[in-house]
Amino acid sequence: MLGYIFKRLLYMIPTLFGMSLISFLIIQLPPGDYLTSMIATMSDSGQTVDPAQIERLKEIYGFDDPFYIQYLKWIWGIVSRGDFGYSFEWGQPVSGLIWARMGSTLVISLLSLLFVWIVALPIGIYSAVRRHSVGDHVFTFFGFIGLAVPNFILALTLMYVAYKYLGQSVGGLNSPQYAGAPWSFAKVGDFLAHLWIPIIIIGASGTAALIRILRANLTDELHKPYVITARAKGLPEYKVILKYPVRIALNPFVSAIGWVLPHLVSGVTITAIVLNLPTAGPLLFRALVSQDMYLAGSFILLLSALTLVGMLLSDLLLALLDPRIRFN
């Protein structure tokens, strides 16, 4: 097992370099660059653009360098100094911008993940064991609603309900009176009171999807010969269901780690913009729109690394959970 892990880690190194090169290339495919966007914005607002200043900025930012020179400078800074470059739009180091958003991003995403698993697991088991019952039809209906309704529509609906009927301020993770205030018990309580909306919204589609997957997998397992034999031998029903069928049907929950880890960082971008959440998703979106190449490239590289780590973790956990995978 250790040899397998070491080999997978070695494979990750060239994969990350390839992903960084492709992402850096894709970011530069649209015509123009950050300075082009800035000049267009200044011209639209009636400001004069000094050509000499533009040339000086191109020299400072290295826009006149060939593509491969820009890429090598960026990737060498990451490897040698942990320097992800400089954000043109924000005027700050990229690493500081990214890590400043990580706290709220991880809190919201991890709680959303727990919400998904806590809700989806019992409902999925119930729907598989009590197929075509009234409860199964109700959960199926709401599951399809959760899959069909866009997250930002659900966000607008819950914002209206929270403001209209609960008297809660909408948008952000704190009430206006706590904006910029130091952390205190009152601010923590207000923060927790605002968390339920993004947790439900971000977790809705994932919960609905995992319920359907778990229901289908567990239904298939419950009709296999070993389950029929266990029932014939008189094992209690809860043991028949929970000991092996549920354990095998949980594989999708574990394999989901491969896409959950990057999702923890990027989040649901449109929903975060609607809710005005201080997470990483809106920052990545803004960097892509403004062609802030080092900020956008660093985000994509981070998401790629988390995807590879998530796939490795899911493979290892699946091997521990399911002996069939371990032996193969």
Model-predicted regions and their roles:
Residues 6-12:
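N-terminal signal-anchor/signal peptide hydrophobic helix marking the start
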Residues 2-3, 102-135, 151, 178-328:
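Alpha-helical transmembrane segments of integral membrane proteins
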Residues 22-29, 62, 76, 142-173, ...:
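Membrane-water interface segments at the C-terminal ends of transmembrane alpha-helices
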Residues 48-80, 275-287:
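Short hydrophobic, aromatic-rich alpha-helical segments embedded in or entering the lipid bilayer
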Residues 62-121:
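An internal, D/E-rich "acidic patch" concept
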